[in-house]
């Protein structure tokens, strides 16, 4: 541990035996052992406390970094628009079923003397409310495929 070999320890023990004598040597060895144990325990306690402090500092640092990251994300949300401005919807002309390459037949001209029948608005609303919703044909290729 300290770079002391067995021969050096034997030399220290022999000097202690000569200085203290055989009567007081066992008590002195016990006291020295207690002191060494206390030193080891105190060093270990200091080491654990330092490691806990380092760990606590690391945890504090991580929490601080996470707090800063969350603040940055909130700032980005505030500064960037949540939704883009909606694009205006363009009115699409009348839906046609026939192919556009086919020639369109000429519509017969209506004589100005004939009057078209007038339908009351209430009857149109009534028909629109009672009409059944249309469903596409099972082999309709204009609709996206549905999941089974």
From Swiss-Prot:
<protein>
    <recommendedName>
        <fullName>Sec-independent protein translocase protein TatB</fullName>
    </recommendedName>
</protein>
<keyword id="KW-0997">Cell inner membrane</keyword>
<comment type="subunit">
    <text>The Tat system comprises two distinct complexes: a TatABC complex, containing multiple copies of TatA, TatB and TatC subunits, and a separate TatA complex, containing only TatA subunits. Substrates initially bind to the TatABC complex, which probably triggers association of the separate TatA complex to form the active translocon.</text>
</comment>
<dbReference type="GO" id="GO:0043953">
    <property type="term" value="P:protein transport by the Tat complex"/>
</dbReference>
<dbReference type="InterPro" id="IPR003369">
    <property type="entry name" value="TatA/B/E"/>
</dbReference>
<comment type="similarity">
    <text>Belongs to the TatB family.</text>
</comment>
<feature type="compositionally biased region" description="Low complexity">
    <location>
        <begin position="107"/>
        <end position="148"/>
    </location>
</feature>
<keyword id="KW-1003">Cell membrane</keyword>
<keyword id="KW-0472">Membrane</keyword>
<comment type="function">
    <text>Part of the twin-arginine translocation (Tat) system that transports large folded proteins containing a characteristic twin-arginine motif in their signal peptide across membranes. Together with TatC, TatB is part of a receptor directly interacting with Tat signal peptides. TatB may form an oligomeric binding site that transiently accommodates folded Tat precursor proteins before their translocation.</text>
</comment>
<dbReference type="GO" id="GO:0033281">
    <property type="term" value="C:TAT protein transport complex"/>
</dbReference>
<keyword id="KW-0653">Protein transport</keyword>
<dbReference type="InterPro" id="IPR018448">
    <property type="entry name" value="TatB"/>
</dbReference>
<keyword id="KW-0813">Transport</keyword>
<dbReference type="Pfam" id="PF02416">
    <property type="entry name" value="TatA_B_E"/>
</dbReference>
<dbReference type="GO" id="GO:0008320">
    <property type="term" value="F:protein transmembrane transporter activity"/>
</dbReference>
<keyword id="KW-1133">Transmembrane helix</keyword>
<keyword id="KW-0812">Transmembrane</keyword>
<feature type="region of interest" description="Disordered">
    <location>
        <begin position="85"/>
        <end position="148"/>
    </location>
</feature>
<feature type="transmembrane region" description="Helical">
    <location>
        <begin position="1"/>
        <end position="21"/>
    </location>
</feature>
<keyword id="KW-0811">Translocation</keyword>
């Amino acid at each position: 541990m300290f770079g002391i070999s067995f021969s050096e320890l034997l030399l220290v023990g022999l000097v202690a035996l000569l200085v203290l004598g055989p009567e007081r040597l066992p008590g002195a060895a016990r006291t020295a052992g207690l002191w060494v144990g206390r030193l080891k325990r105190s060093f270990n306690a200091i080491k654990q406390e330092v490691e806990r402090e380092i760990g606590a500092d690391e945890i504090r640092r991580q929490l601080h970094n996470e707090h800063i990251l969350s603040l940055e994300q909130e700032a980005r949300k505030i500064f960037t628009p949540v939704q883009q401005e909606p694009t205006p919807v363009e009115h699409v002309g009348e839906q046609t079923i026939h192919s556009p390459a086919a020639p369109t037949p000429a519509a017969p001209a209506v004589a100005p003397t004939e009057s078209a029948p007038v339908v009351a608005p209430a009857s149109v609303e009534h028909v629109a409310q009672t009409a059944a919703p249309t469903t596409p044909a099972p082999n309709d290729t204009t609709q996206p495929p549905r999941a089974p």
